[in-house]
């Protein structure tokens, strides 16, 4: 399929710069795959579409304030470092993006805060990419504590604003557990603890997996032929208890609802020949685009995504290309909010 098929005009005013006051008060478009029916609801109405013994699968990856501002040794020039991925746990070796890249060279030392963190540039990986070694003698947990104090929430440029205090809480799901992601699962941002409890009381099984989302969800795809697109690998874990819960739902012909395209990516990475979920841990660069035969998920919660973005392609693979493009035109007409802090869609 061609990338240009996913191009549409999105008014910039529909890109939400801030979240709604209450997570579950975002709007929810419900799209019925089989009939093409479209309903306009509020996110808390999700409870009406999930029943007893249905399963809701969450991505519990936790982001951290991964954007650091510092200075170069000797010159004192101001620099910016975006921590992308920890390369060796406990060794404080990181894959990063830096600005201004042309001034940050191998051998440079970079200082953050009042010298609480010092890093040495070990390698150039891309035009903006650098491998940094943080000269830090503490534990991994102590390192993250300092980063939490010095770092800023890495909001996407499309929001056109600097991070604010509320982003520390709102740019994170209420169920985040495992630190390592640089982007949160957008669809999960709509869940409040209250809504999750209501779902549990209704008999919905809520079960986690972990996929540490990288920058793929922020990027606009840069090749026309989607079969030639190469995405970075992301670390994931599907625990045994989630496998049992999901497979039981499939055996009982109950819904398996994935929260976010990162969740369907993890689930579809680890499917047996018989169409059942398997425990898995490792890295995935699975690319999902139309047409695609989903083996595990029966419904999907996702946000409204930017044109020519990977999450949009994933959503179209699940909901059907024509129906998704129709739904997006309706969303624009009805002034739904897009992107990270935008509204949600339930595809059933």
From Swiss-Prot:
Assembly behavior: Monomer.
Subcellular location: Cytoplasm
GO biological process: queuosine biosynthetic process; tRNA wobble guanine modification
Recorded metabolic or biological pathway in which this protein acts: tRNA modification; tRNA-queuosine biosynthesis
The protein's name: S-adenosylmethionine:tRNA ribosyltransferase-isomerase
GN (gene name): queA
GO terms of molecular function: S-adenosylmethionine:tRNA ribosyltransferase-isomerase activity
Catalysed reactions, semicolon-separated: 7-aminomethyl-7-carbaguanosine(34) in tRNA + S-adenosyl-L-methionine = epoxyqueuosine(34) in tRNA + adenine + L-methionine + 2 H(+)
Cytoplasm listed as a keyword: yes
NCBIfam families: PRK00147.1 (NF001140), queA (TIGR00113)
Organism expressing this protein natively: Amoebophilus asiaticus (strain 5a2)
Tagged with keyword Transferase: yes
């Amino acid at each position: 399929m061609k990338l240009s098929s996913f191009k549409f005009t999105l008014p910039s005013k529909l890109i939400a710069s801030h979240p709604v006051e209450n997570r579950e008060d975002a709007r929810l478009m419900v799209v019925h795959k089989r009939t093409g029916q479209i309903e306009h609801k509020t996110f808390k109405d999700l409870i009406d579409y999930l029943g007893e013994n249905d399963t809701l699968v969450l991505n519990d990856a936790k982001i951290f304030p991964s954007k650091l501002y510092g200075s170069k040794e000797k010159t004192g020039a101001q620099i910016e470092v975006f921590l992308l991925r920890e390369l060796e746990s406990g060794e404080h070796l990181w894959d990063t993006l830096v600005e201004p890249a042309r001034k940050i060279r191998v051998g440079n030392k970079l200082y953050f805060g009042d010298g609480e963190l010092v890093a040495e540039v070990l390698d150039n990986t891309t035009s903006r990419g650098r491998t940094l070694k943080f000269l830090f003698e503490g534990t991994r947990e102590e390192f993250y504590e300092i980063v939490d104090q010095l770092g800023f929430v890495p909001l996407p440029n499309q929001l056109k604003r600097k991070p604010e205090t509320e982003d520390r809480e709102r740019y994170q799901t209420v169920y985040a557990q495992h630190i390592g992601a640089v982007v949160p699962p957008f669809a999960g941002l709509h869940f409040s603890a209250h809504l999750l409890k209501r779902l549990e009381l209704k008999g919905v099984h809520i079960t986690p997996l972990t996929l540490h989302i990288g920058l793929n969800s922020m990027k606009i795809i840069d090749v026309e032929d989607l079969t030639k697109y190469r995405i970075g690998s992301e670390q994931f874990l599907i625990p045994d208890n989630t496998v049992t819960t999901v497979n039981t739902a499939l055996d009982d012909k109950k819904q398996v609802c994935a929260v976010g395209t990162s969740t369907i990516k993890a689930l579809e990475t680890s499917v047996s020949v018989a169409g059942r979920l398997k425990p898995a841990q490792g890295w995935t660069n699975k690319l999902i685009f139309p047409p695609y035969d989903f083996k595990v998920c029966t419904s999907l919660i996702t946000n409204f995504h930017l044109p020519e973005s990977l999450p949009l392609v994933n959503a179209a693979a699940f909901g059907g290309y024509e129906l998704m493009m129709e739904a997006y035109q309706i969303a624009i007409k009805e002034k739904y909010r897009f992107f990270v802090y935008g509204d949600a869609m339930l595809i059933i």
